Amino acid sequence: MNDEPFDDDIAYFHAQWRRQRLTEKGRDYVVLDGVKGEGHYVGTYLALTTLERYWWGEGEFKFYIDDDEEYPTICGTGTEDYFGGSWSFAKQVNGKTVEQNYCTPYLGYPYYSSHDELIHNDYHNDDCPPMRGFYRWHIPDPIRFL
């Protein structure tokens, strides 16, 4: 390892991991903060468990970039829209709404489950709150910051 400081124009990789048991109503959930220097936002993987069985997707993704304070540079219309699932991630099958997973190179919904497949108990069902996994990589649409 070189103990000398790096030049200011060298790119750094920043990654953050967060977990919050319950989100607070009316308060934004922060995905990334505290990044210094210039670069571009590469993407997000979001794992989400809903504690109710009904619609979970509202809550727009906001990107406060550089000197943004009151209003974000980018503001979406809903969590499902950010991950490419406008009008939900579902289809109708025999009169029932069924979750529809998908994967593309830059965004997707690869995981859905409402069953706990790791635990078996003869006295209880294997159902659990719905769990979802989403990703979006900003390769074709980089979000740059200075």
For each predicted feature, which ranges?
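Beta-strand-centric surfaces of beta-sandwich/beta-rich domains
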Residues: 1-146
